[in-house]
Amino acid sequence: MNNLNIYFVGLSKNCLLTLKKNIDFINLLIKEGVGVEKIIIVDSDSNDGTKEYCKSLKNDNILFIEEDNVKNNFHNRIEILSHCRNIGLQNIEKTNDVLYIPIDLDIDLFSLIKPKSFIDLVKNFQNNKDIDALFPYSEPYYYDIFALRKQGWVDNNAVLQAHKLKQKFKIGSFFF
């Protein structure tokens, strides 16, 4: 499995307990020889011990980025998620074949799958060069589609469109 570099990119804010569970699962994958190139964690304003835990993890395979005071520059949660996720994406090195796996660190992402099943899933992607990302599915429904901004993944920037409309018209919105 060494011909595919896997990057786990996740955002954290006050999610210490689930973050630990997700990191433990990824460490099991590393022990099984899965080609985990890097775990990238972008934290914004945690105050529950998440930052300290992430700092204790820092090594060649774990990149911890602190992006604090984001509420001063962005007006809503989706803009903050988008900004922080883009910071994480910028740290993926495109030198070899890469599989990007975003991890929502505030949920126990791997509680419903065993390491072997996940490894088998990753192996399926090795031979399919048209896939460069694996997105999590969870119940209850949890998916930050509006925060995804990698070119080619989302054709329309709904946040930007809503922002422009709000400048012209007096409208409200559910997400923006």
Regions found by a protein language model. Give the residues of each.
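Conserved catalytic core of nucleotide-sugar-dependent glycosyltransferases
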Residues: 107-176
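Short beta-strand/loop segment that forms part of the nucleotide-sugar
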Residues: 10-11, 35-45, 67
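Short beta-strand-to-loop acidic/aromatic patch adjacent to the donor-nucleotide binding site
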Residues: 96-112
